[in-house]
From Swiss-Prot:
Top-level division of the source organism's lineage: Bacteria
Protein name: Aminomethyltransferase
GO terms under cellular component: cytosol; glycine cleavage complex
One BP term from GO: glycine decarboxylation via glycine cleavage system
Protein family membership: Belongs to the GcvT family.
The EC number(s) this enzyme carries: 2.1.2.10
Entry-linked InterPro entries: GCS_T, GCS_T_bac, GCST_C, GCV_T_N, GcvT/YgfZ/DmdA, GcvT/YgfZ_C, TrmE/GcvT_dom1
Lineage summary: Bacteria, Pseudomonadati, Pseudomonadota, Betaproteobacteria, Neisseriales
Organism: Neisseria meningitidis serogroup B (strain ATCC BAA-335 / MC58)
Alphabetical UniProt keywords: Aminotransferase, Transferase
UniProt KW Hydrolase keyword: no
Quaternary organization: The glycine cleavage system is composed of four proteins: P, T, L and H.
GO MF annotation: an example: transaminase activity
Record function comment: The glycine cleavage system catalyzes the degradation of glycine.
């Protein structure tokens, strides 16, 4: 068996009493004692997550902009200034999702960009970058030397700035989906995966443990993968491998907004397949499900509607709502507000809701 990879924060996790598990070949915390307390810290105060398993790749070259316009379904031409971020799907030729990622523009000349992509898809993402990059002559620099920490919650920025007061002007000026280079390989962006305000900090691996411990002292709760999953589920955010994959179109996974077809002259990987699917008609759509009574919704449960069957793609007990929730794909022409889920052979009633369930600590439905 191959040894699990560790992040630059590994010692800090051990010192904080983390229960470590195998996540896509990485040894990462599932929790530090109480997943529920960690979830609640992010919804009401401040929590932090080690996301160093995600891959930071710096891309440079005279044709870098043209490369990205080919590589991803969203259009980097929208990145109007340095530091602006774009969320996109990375598609295969069949229009399936290889990964979802964020691209930052990192210089004025539009010749340098930074990609942040998922840890579990690292190899196939990199293969796709190189495959598409060949004709554009761009250089890739995977930043294995860096760590990444998400600091999230209504008090996240306030507590972060007690540790890094010199960042105040920069951080206060960041709007959502903007990042800033702080020098010496420190980078901060107003992004996250929780449905709360906060930032993600990319930093030298050598400084990771000290930064983590300083934030702990400032009252930021270390949080594991368990809370990360319940938070992103409440926020209605997709998890790669559950809610979309190589065989799922972004149009079937609530990601249609990330596909930019405005510039008809732009050809991107997977475009022909997406247009063909649009022409034919997308058969399914993504919705949220809420279980009003006991039990837990899980992935791959059958959803029964008056327009046919669907399936849950992720399911969890929501600590904020105190009820079980799921993300599901159902027939496109189903527009009811109730359905049934097959749970241990029984049909159970669920409410059908528009995602997200929770945003900025507030429930998003009546």
């Amino acid at each position: 068996m191959t040894a699990l990879k560790t992040t630059p924060f590994h010692q800090a996790h051990q010192d904080a009493g983390a229960k470590l598990v195998d996540f896509a070949g990485w040894e990462l915390p599932i929790h530090y004692g109480s997943q529920i307390a960690e979830h609640e810290a992010v919804r009401t105060d401040a929590g932090m997550f080690d996301v160093s398993h995600m891959l930071v790749t710096d891309v440079a070259g005279a044709n870098a902009k043209a490369f990205f316009r080919k590589l991803i379904a969203n259009d980097v031409a929208k990145l109007a200034f340095v530091g602006k971020a774009l969320y996109s799907a990375l598609l295969n030729d069949n229009g399936g999702v290889i990964d979802d990622l964020i691209v930052y523009r990192t210089n004025e000349a539009e010749t340098q960009y930074r990609i942040v992509s998922n840890g579990a898809t690292r190899e196939k993402d990199t293969a796709q970058f190189h495959k598409v990059g060949q004709e554009f002559g761009v250089a890739f620099n995977p930043r294995y030397d860096l760590g990444m920490l998400a600091v999230q919650g209504p008090k996240a920025i306030e507590k972060l700035l007690t540790v890094k007061p010199e960042w105040a002007d920069v951080v206060h000026n960041l709007k959502p989906f903007q990042g800033a280079d702080l020098g010496n390989d420190w980078f901060v962006a107003r992004t996250g995966y929780t449905g709360e305000d906060g930032v993600e900090v990319i930093l030298p691996g050598t400084e990771a443990v000290a930064f983590f411990k300083a934030l702990q002292q400032a009252g930021v709760q270390p949080c594991g993968l368990g809370a990360r999953d319940t938070l992103r589920m409440e926020a209605g955010m997709n998890l790669y491998g559950n809610d979309m994959d190589d065989d799922t179109s972004p149009l079937e996974a609530g990601m249609g907004w990330t596909v930019d077809l405005k510039d008809e002259s732009r050809d991107f990987v997977g475009k022909a397949a997406l247009l063909a699917l649009k022409e034919k008609g997308v058969a399914v759509k993504q919705v949220g499900l809420l279980l009003e009574k006991g039990g837990i919704l899980r992935a791959h449960m059958e959803v029964l509607t008056d327009k046919g069957q669907g399936e849950t793609t992720s399911g969890v007990f929501s600590p904020s709502l105190k009820q079980s929730i799921a993300i599901a794909r159902v027939p496109k022409d189903f527009d009811g507000d109730t359905a049934k889920v097959l749970m241990r052979g029984k049909e159970v009633d669920v409410r059908v809701l528009k995602l997200p369930f929770v945003r900025n600590g507030q429930k998003q439905f009546d």
